[in-house]
A protein has these predicted regions:
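PRPP-associated nucleotide enzymes
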Residues: 1-328
Length: 328
């Protein structure tokens, strides 16, 4: 966590490279290598490693938040998840050798988002008795706070889903299966007659907010702030174009790629794919953007071998995590 915080703050300060020049244990060197550090080609008595921070990639570590109790707190399960995460970091360093792979913890982002929301709403972070609600309401429209209530804050989720065409050539933002249409959900938000704090996990391509913004404006919803876990320079410019105030837990000026761990693991997560017939109850048609299911969009620039190793890592990690869940 300390390494992540140091690197993320350096990115916010527009640093281009990070250098490690000090004695280090094997565990520390392994941690640095999993972040993308490579040995410098210079003579040195101490370990000398550096990493290019100009176009970092982000890995969102969210398997623990995807699992439900009692598995999400089981030590054996968490050990398997941790081992899978380390393998994933190493596989990602092969995509862009020498470039920073910043691993961010979804639980840390979640708690910091909650703190920011209650501070904005002027309420304590712990439930009060009697219950006293702040004037603003929290409206998650991504995945990070879906199904969670913020202390002393009216919370209502806009349930959205990114749905890909069968050939994966395009995608649209639609209402999550079995929920009302997006305009109906937005009208429900409007009926609360409260200033709104919109919350999402990532603002980089801004696909969800681009789809929601016209509907929110049409219904006259008072958006006080767009609050996200990770904000890129592109996302900040998009919010400036939409004239929306924005804040974040992490700000990364230049973001090359982002990877959501659960979305890469088959049978644990994935992206929804549109089908002609209704899905089986309890099951949603989905796909993971890894081999052999699909060719990742970054395959041409990263090379076949790196993409193959990443896909293999995802398949093996999903097998190990699911196998541990079955045994527990």
């Amino acid at each position: 966590l300390m390494m992540t915080e140091a690197l993320s703050r350096s990115l916010g300060a527009d640093c281009s490279y990070a250098v490690w020049h000090a004695t280090a244990s094997e565990e520390t060197l392994d941690l640095l290598e999993r972040q993308g550090f490579v040995p410098a080609e210079l003579p040195s008595a101490k370990p000398l490693l550096l990493v290019d921070m100009r176009s970092p990639s982000v890995l969102l570590q969210n398997i623990p938040t995807t699992l439900k109790e009692p598995f999400s707190s089981d030590r054996t399960v968490l050990a398997a998840v941790r081992a899978a995460h380390c393998r994933m970091q190493r596989a990602l360093t092969g995509l862009y050798p020498g470039s920073l792979i910043l691993s961010l913890n979804a639980e840390v982002i979640y708690h910091r988002l909650v703190r920011k929301i209650v501070d904005l709403n002027g309420v304590p972070a712990e439930p009060t008795v009697p219950r006293v609600l702040g004037p603003k309401m929290c409206v998650p429209f991504g995945k990070i706070l879906r199904g969670n209530a913020i202390p002393n804050t009216v919370t209502k989720t806009i349930h959205t889903d990114r749905v890909y065409s069968p050939d994966l050539s395009e995608s649209t933002i639609e209402a999550f299966p079995n929920y009302a249409s997006i305009p109906c959900q937005v009208r429900t938000i409007k009926s609360f007659d409260r200033p709104v704090i919109l919350v999402d996990d990532l603002m980089h391509p801004g696909v969800r907010i681009k789809a929601l913004d016209p509907v929110l404006r049409q219904e006259g919803v008072d958006i006080q702030l767009v609050l996200v876990g990770i904000l890129s320079g592109y996302g900040r410019d998009l919010m400036s174009q939409q004239k929306r105030p924005v804040d974040s837990v992490y700000f990364l000026p230049s973001l090359r790629q982002w990877f959501v761990e659960a979305t890469l693991y088959p049978f644990i997560g994935g992206n929804t794919v549109r089908r002609s017939r209704p899905p089986v109850p309890g099951l949603l048609p989905g796909i993971n953007h890894i081999l052999p299911y699909a060719v990742p969009p970054f395959a041409k620039e990263c090379g076949e071998e790196a993409v193959f190793q990443l896909s293999r890592c995802c398949l093996e990690s999903a097998r190990d995590v699911i196998g541990t869940l079955e045994r527990e």
